Amino acid sequence: MLIKYVEFIKSATRAAHYPPGDLPEIAFAGRSNVGKSSLINVLVNRKSLVRTSSTPGRTQLINFFDVNGQFTLVDLPGYGFAKVPLAVKKQWGPMMENYLAKRANLRGVILILDIRRTPVAEDIQMLHWLQAYSIKPILVITKCDKVSKNERGKQSRIIAQTLGVETEELNFFSALNREGKDLIWRRIEEVLPAETAGSAGEAPKAT
């Protein structure tokens, strides 16, 4: 996917504040500190399009970004951070289900997991929601440079078994060495309308 430009559109907490659903959307979901911001920044070849919060999980906002005027990238709020107030945790479920259930232009969700961690209840809940609403999940396993080849194989089997999927459905990624970047773009292009998806490739450097 050749990235010509990426622009922030707006943040929202409820459907009434979402931007118009004129373009197909690809959303990114995952627990706090899973590497979601780094994944998005690498994919669009920007250093700080999405910034990592100093208080992970505390800001419960859905952030929308225009990509090339062709589709919308949606950064969903992280979940599972232990220090988040209970009231904030309770907001996450209804906010996510409302977005997934009512956003008709949502074409796929990148569900992000850390290679070193076993999926948590919220990861499984998110996958079940996607399956219930017939939304294509793209499973991305981050921080793969932090484990050995043998450990990657072992953890992949644990993650797949916990989620109830095949290991072949897992897409491996490293923000450090860019492993998996082109493959993930191909997975995204598979769920975008044909007229939107371009050929996978290196995005131009940001100016």
Curated annotation (Swiss-Prot):
Claim: Ubl conjugation is one of the keywords in the record? no
Q: Which domain of life is it from?
A: Bacteria
Q: Which residues bind GTP?
A: 30-37, 57-61, 75-78, 142-145, 173-175
Start and end residues of each EngB-type G domain = 22-194
The protein's GO terms of the molecular function aspect are: GTP binding; metal ion binding
Which GO annotations describe the biological process of this protein?
Answer: division septum assembly
Coiled coil ranges: none
User: Which InterPro entries does this entry report, sorted A to Z?
Assistant: G_ENGB_dom (IPR030393), GTP-bd (IPR006073), GTP-bd_ribosome_bio_YsxC (IPR019987), P-loop_NTPase (IPR027417), Small_GTP-bd (IPR005225)
One Pfam annotation reads: MMR_HSR1
Which terms are listed as keywords in the entry? Answer: Cell cycle, Cell division, GTP-binding, Magnesium, Metal-binding, Nucleotide-binding, Septation
Keyword Cell division in annotation: yes
- CC cofactor: Mg(2+)
| Binding site residues for Mg(2+) | S37, T59
Disulfide bridges in this chain = none
Q: What's this protein's function?
A: Necessary for normal cell division and for the maintenance of normal septation.
Which family does the record claim for this protein? Belongs to the TRAFAC class TrmE-Era-EngA-EngB-Septin-like GTPase superfamily. EngB GTPase family.
- Can you say what this protein is called? Probable GTP-binding protein EngB
